[in-house]
């Protein structure tokens, strides 16, 4: 690896940093850039229908600032801005944002697109990075700064073209992470001198990690230094715009907020140039999982995903935090066992969510518990038992869980694939209640006095009708005696469990019998019926069919 072709970047030496001792206790201001930064990164940019679907979804989720396009860069973006203004589709409490480069023709075209809007953020930018000044523009620092201040002056002068509109300004020194920190500050302060913000009408200074160039802690150092030194701090909103080139955009945003930033721009599930923008959904749900109101409504995360996938024509990864198909799923046996016990411990109602391996309750994002546990060859008894409990109301005794999980594992090892809940049920019924069982209980008559219980049971044995009579100290013991005397079926009942059924069957009771053969081997039988007596007798017959 040619690592010697690269060098580390340290934006500032900040030995007295304070951000590590801060905590995230409230949500920043959110701005979605799905319709602009996200859209420009797509293989196939959104058509009007997809843009509208995304815009509607962002409003439903509670975004109050939405960057809706780059109207001077393309006719479709211009038309979309005009559509949502002319059709009155922007709620009173939502501010749209439009992007423009610091070029006079583009700024004028941008203002033309805004006639009739009640409030708008005009976001103008130019690249200030050392590399782009040298390689792209061939300009010195003063020349690049003048581009920014000239744009600010023009923007202010064009306010008169839309007297009904409240204008808010945002300036980005693009490639902030590749710009000398003192120079980025100098340019931002110069822009602020033109805009003349106040605490009531602040200027947004957006500090993009246009390319993520260093670790999140260094980004936080840069943000804290900037917040300390920027003029008019009480009249400035410091905004973050992290990209994910190093895979740490979420961490960079979180540490940047700790360092003093007020606002974050990002996209749903991180769509954006190259490796993407910061994922606002992950940021919001990270706050949520720590007991902080995210100030976004993500109670139907699957709908948000479906809209994003439709609009972007890109899939959301199965492992994507909070939203991926598998993020609430455990295949590992030990994980499944811990989840099963955790779910039982908190019950249906709880004050505080505490379940192993599940950082949040899936129901809080609109998910169900259905996919929490899925079974493959890595799974153990806990996962199988959990699915039988949730799908069919069965509470298998622990020893029976071990026995049956081996049956399931044999199948998963043979196929090498996941096994579905319905397939697990098929294995269960085939094992314990097969339709073609050798012995089948047709009916029974039980009588008892103070000394004994007697049973007359009508059976079908290998297709032949058989009557079994037995006597014992209870119905199970009596049936065992009858089977032993008349059919030479010899085993004893080692353990017995029963419970009412709550789901998944027309039967109302289930019984489990652990049988022990004369050689010391053990196995289980299961019976289900409308009465607990019949269920217990069915369990004995099940064990008799499975005798080893």
Predicted regions and their residues:
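A mid-to-C-terminal "edge-of-domain" accessory segment
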Residues: 1-36, 291-469, 505-510
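Catalytic alpha/beta core domains of metabolic enzymes, predominantly
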Residues: 214-348
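Short, small-residue-enriched loops and turns at beta-alpha junctions
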Residues: 37, 41-42, 71-75, 129-131, ...
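Mixed-charge, glycine-accented linear interaction segment located at domain edges/termini
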Residues: 521-524, 528-548
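Short beta-alpha connecting loops at secondary-structure transitions
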Residues: 132, 207-209, 237, 265-273, ...
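Alpha/beta enzyme core
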Residues: 3-4, 30, 41-65, 81-87, ...
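A conserved regulatory-domain signal marking ACT and ACT-like small-molecule sensing domains
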Residues: 447-453, 463, 469-521, 530-531
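N-terminal capping/small domains of soluble enzymes
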Residues: 1-104, 367, 372-375, 379, ...
